[in-house]
Each structure stands twice: as C-alpha cells, then as structure tokens.
Curated annotation (Swiss-Prot):
GO biological process, one term: tRNA wobble guanine modification
Protein's name in the database: S-adenosylmethionine:tRNA ribosyltransferase-isomerase
Cellular component, GO annotation: cytoplasm
Top-level EC class as recorded in UniProt: transferase
Pfam families (alphabetical): Queuosine_synth (PF02547)
The encoding gene: queA
Subcellular location: Cytoplasm
HAMAP family: QueA
Molecular function via GO: S-adenosylmethionine:tRNA ribosyltransferase-isomerase activity
UniProt organism field: Gloeobacter violaceus (strain ATCC 29082 / PCC 7421)
Pathway: tRNA modification; tRNA-queuosine biosynthesis
Organismal lineage: Bacteria, Bacillati, Cyanobacteriota, Cyanophyceae, Gloeobacterales
Amino acid sequence: MNAPIDERDFLTDSYDYALPERCIAQQPAEPRDHSRLLVVDGEAHTHRYFYDLPGLLRPGDLLVLNDTRVIPARLFGSKASGGRVEVLLLEPRAPREWLCLVKPARRLAVGARIDFDGVLAARVTELDAETGGRWLRFEGEEDFEAALERVGHTPLPPYLKTGRTRDERYQTLWASRPGAVAAPTAGLHFSGELLARLAERGIERATVTLHVGLGTFRPVQSVSVHTHRMHREWYEIPEATAIAIERTRSRGGRVLAVGTTSARALESAAQPNGLPATGPGRSELFVYPGYRWRVVEGLITNFHLPRSSLLMLVSSLVGRERLLALYREAVDKGYRFYSFGDAMLILPGAGA
C-alpha cells in the first residue's frame, strides 16, 4: 500500500502544481454519481465514471463512510459598537462554547459581546494563540442547534464563487451527526441508486465520524512536512465498524475508505493488529510519504489543492511523482477539481 519515497517527498514545494481556474468545479455533477472517476489499479490507470464503481470493486469489499454532517457554521453578527463581525465555528469544548475564527479579530477582546440578528448572542471568553481565533460562549434560551439553523450559513470553501449551490448538495446522503465545518467531499458522489447497486453486488458499508475542521482550510506553510502541525479533529469509531473490518479481512475482502477524513479516522485509531480501537478520540494525524498504513487498503478521494496535507496523504498511497503526473493528465482531459469536482479510486496495490 505504501509508495517508495525520496527526500523531495518531505519538501512542501514538491507538492505544487499548476491548475487552470477553469478546472475548479463550481457546481456538483448532476446526478451525483455522474462525476468522472480516475481509477488507479497497480501500475495501470483508467478513466471511468463514478457510477461504474460497483463493477470496479469485489463482492466482500467494505466501504467506510464518514457520517458527519456540515453545520451552518458561518455566522454574521454585530459588536456593541455596531461593527460587523464574521464568525466561523471550528470546534466545541461544550455544547454552547466554541473555538471560532472571527473577522476582523482586531479589537475583539475577552468580554466583547456579539449579537446575531437577535436570535443568538455570544461573549468572548478566551483568545486562542494557536489559531488566532476566539473562544465564544453562546447565550440564549433557544436550543443551540435550532438557533444555528435560523441564523447560520453553510461555510462553502472560498474557491466556490457561486451562491447557487443548494445546501443539501454539500451534504452526503448519510450525513447524520452534526459537527463538521466542511463536507467529506468524496461521499458527495454517491446517489441512492448507486448505494443500492453496491449492496446488490455484495459490497458492504460501515461508518465512522470525523468532524471536518480547520485543517481543511489550512495549507501547509512550512518548508518541510516534518514541521507542519495538523489541527485536531474529533472522531469516533463505532464498535460495529471495527467488527465489520475484522469480518471483511477474515473473508478476504478489502477495506476502502471513502475520503481522506474516513481514512484519517481509521488510521488515528489503528492498533498493531490492523484493527481500529473503538470509541471517540482527537486526531492530529498527518499522513505523507513514508507513512505505514495499518487499516486502510484503498481510497476514494477527490482532486486536492496544491501544497495541501490531503495531496500529501494521497501521495503516500501512489507516490508523489506518479500522483502529480496523474493530476496533469486529469487537467489535460478536463477533469473537475476540489470539493464539487471528480474523483479518484485508488485500489490496493497502487503504490507497490
């Protein structure tokens, strides 16, 4: 599963590539499963469509999905002075206390109060040196999630320039556990019909939860990957998923993660026996070439930003130079990149 490495694999500059703006998808494919699919199988690769997935997998394979749900985490409020403030919820430490990115952060000191359209209010309780953000305690009697639904907005990535996307298209069909500030985008390609066809072929499904957080928005700024620090993200591995993985292995099936977030959750919980420990945890796992995969054998993933930790994770499976060559070919063939773009299927053995 692991690709050969060289010293350039540890330099952030080695993960740069040119991407024409026309390749950045502004709308999702319709229907969901009509996106294109670049299949990497051993030393070969082919160009297919996502609806071909059942025929590309084997009966007895297991797909592990991230069931997190994107919350309306982008808020617009006012300070007592009348100045406007934009808030992005990142991570809770209590139901009504969240680490947030705020703009403008200047002059938003501890004790400052922000009002959100008379529905919610929050007070700054602490500054966060690591992120430059603020800890906010939200006030009010209304249920917090209900209030968020009233005043919050889906935090679409900054490279999406259109406002025409329906919020439900930025959720997977199985999204059930609120807490993410970005979607696990590999799951956006699955339609109800495709899920039914996968089940008919004997391909099983299991879930994990990883609430996608700040790390999605942070490029790797350091010169070397060795000095980059990932932002922590909350995850949970259900007992049923660990059992499904063990059963899949015992029957000769393969474990494929749907998305880098599912992969990071499983690998963060990995034990020496190749099974994930069950229960909740917090992941700061940074995967790049040289990483030894213990649970995940294959991956479904989108096309990622230059110099991103996600690009480095995928490079650990297929090799950096090969991955960048595949990306160049995808650009030439008109593939669509990023959150609403096309996908890759990396089958076990691609990095051999």
